[in-house]
Swiss-Prot record:
Protein name: Putative aldehyde dehydrogenase AldA
Entry EC no(s): 1.2.1.3
Gene transcribed to yield this protein: aldA
Taxonomic source organism: Staphylococcus aureus (strain NCTC 8325 / PS 47)
Alphabetical keyword list: NAD, Oxidoreductase
Pfam families: Aldedh
Amino acid sequence: MAVNVRDYIAENYGLFINGEFVKGSSDETIEVTNPATGETLSHITRAKDKDVDHAVKVAQEAFESWSLTSKSERAQMLRDIGDKLMAQKDKIAMIETLNNGKPIRETTAIDIPFAARHFHYFASVIETEEGTVNDIDKDTMSIVRHEPIGVVGAVVAWNFPMLLAAWKIAPAIAAGNTIVIQPSSSTPLSLLEVAKIFQEVLPKGVVNILTGKGSESGNAIFNHDGVDKLSFTGSTDVGYQVAEAAAKHLVPATLELGGKSANIILDDANLDLAVEGIQLGILFNQGEVCSAGSRLLVHEKIYDQLVPRLQEAFSNIKVGNPQDEATQMGSQTGKDQLDKIQSYIDAAKESDAQILAGGHRLTENGLDKGFFFEPTLIAVPDNHHKLAQEEIFGPVLTVIKVKDDQEAIDIANDSEYGLAGGVFSQNITRALNIAKAVRTGRIWINTYNQVPEGAPFGGYKKSGIGRETYKGALSNYQQVKNIYIDTSNALKGLY
């Protein structure tokens, strides 16, 4: 399926500030390409510090009125955004596929619908949110209010551009904040098109979208004195810098960072379910998922039964044109990511690891202009191996044999990360005991990589701070105010 890019994407995009697309302070632009073909899709404005300052000041001004907008009005606007996203689902999904390289079947069924659902969800959350009143005694009352923080500064990664943006924008504006958000410079196009929906629905200045380099305008957002709350999804290395900026300015930060999650397959697992779950864990979105189940821990009793099934399953995955609805895996998002994956394959070949499936870039049948890689399965001798400790961020699965549940738990916890994990077992008690023992923010049982609204998502250890995608995430974007009332009209007698 070939599409006319200009039916979906503009030739150039400005910065979205105060409800309008505007020129930046510099004439510099960044080329945005289709990673599956190398084709130029658009050019975006390269924001500078002056543009960040402009956007933050606009957001500060908009906050004065937006923070006073009633919950019912805000909720209706969030629902309108969600409705319009769904009405334009096919168009926005195609933009995401063209810009990111992921299959159209994923962007149509997951990325855009789930983004829309987050706006609907947080509309309901604020409508049902209630403060509390505590009658301390007959003359004293304590009222607890939840108030917006102010201007949110956010930067999101390139692997789920629209969905990750929705994770931050929806709760932030639902709580009454305004936001300055920057998508990755390589995958900004879906959010820039969705800005047209914000333009229709929201007051000016509530959502402002900058484009540029993370090391430039992204860093300027996080270090701006006018930003009251930071939110970031990306690598742990950059997460440290964001945390440092938050500490320097004494503002709160929500960080969703890297992972090296363990997917544990017990000897009583339903193997049909496990094979599907393993593929969901490592091949979904080409393995470019922070929660990817990239360490497979298989009970020794079923190892020789499961591994050949995985080899066959991996070899049958259709990797190809992301616009083809039959494609199961598309292109990696860029050359840097492909090179990183290849470096780990080279490390495997130079070590005592054994490549059981895949391990090659795909260039035949018209794939030579993109960044396509085979689903790859690699057996490593133990969890100390480089491939079992470091985040690869691609369709590369390391498999380790374990003798019992405790060894699986110990290996799962032997990581600097703690974002997610999985357990496959037909014994729910056994699975729950492992889930409770593994130190991660999310554990799936008998499935993997499901990320609906209404279930908290976030990590332990170096995988981040805070939780998103559930009603408690609203508190990330709120201040708690206590109003303490004494109705006795009596002196205390201390002075």
